[in-house]
UniProtKB/Swiss-Prot annotation:
GO terms for biological process: D-tagatose 6-phosphate catabolic process; galactitol catabolic process. This is D-tagatose-1,6-bisphosphate aldolase subunit GatY. Pathway: Carbohydrate metabolism; D-tagatose 6-phosphate degradation; D-glyceraldehyde 3-phosphate and glycerone phosphate from D-tagatose 6-phosphate: step 2/2. It comes from the Bacteria. The keyword Lyase applies. One of its GO terms (molecular function) is zinc ion binding. The active site is at 82 (proton donor). Its EC number is 4.1.2.40. PROSITE patterns: ALDOLASE_CLASS_II_1 (PS00602), ALDOLASE_CLASS_II_2 (PS00806). The gene is gatY.
Amino acid sequence: MYVVSTKQMLNNAQRGGYAVPAFNIHNLETMQVVVETAASMHAPVIIAGTPGTFTHVGTENLMALVSAMAKQYHHPLAIHLDHHTKFDDIAQKVRSGVRSVMIDASHLPFAQNISRVKEVVDFCHRFDVSVEAELGQLGGQEDDVQVNEADAFYTNPVQAREFAEATGIDSLAVAIGTAHGMYARAPALDFSRLENIRQWVNLPLVLHGASGLSTKDIQQTIKLGICKINVATELKNAFSQALKNYLTEHPEATDPRDYLQSAKSAMRDVVSKVIADCGCEGRA
């Protein structure tokens, strides 16, 4: 079985002291880059898609593509709903075969966040689907969800335990100073807060907004309990900038099979670096 749940992946990472990267993909080419690189490095990876990606590609198409590529490369892959907010949307995708979900109700007050997440957990666990939820909010924009930096807030360690116990989630996304998008300056991550959260919560912890973080910061968060690292913007930026450069230098280019190669190569460099930073090479 090559398409797997994230639950076992993250539990293995927690025991092994490494993290599994979740790469946001958008089309066939970005999927190829992630899977080919992961297979060559024998690394566990999660294929993540926002609601916009699932709409763009089509849920059934995306599921079929992940399954086909996992079999082609004899490499286990997990497909994950990233930053999904609507119960009916999640339910439809779970019934289509998705086995890993992030329900993002972090914009709601604490009690309502618990209620919304528990509803999703109760449904998903009937299908053996793992559920991630977020406590605290990251600044920046992910798909159509935007949070002003002034409105972002950090995860409360004591509330984190209550949240985990009340909802029954399988992994917890924490807010410790990262943001969606690229950073204008290096973020000041609250490592002491992360260490405190780890003392209160024994679940695999998830770090969103990792695009542009230094190797040192990523590896320090892993030492303090992060088991899943989300990367999106850095992939898009590398892919699109390389494509722009190529078409500027080769205005006569018309064959996507040719001009997309430079974009894929640039994105591949990012994927391989993140895998190395996460310490998961050879862990698949």
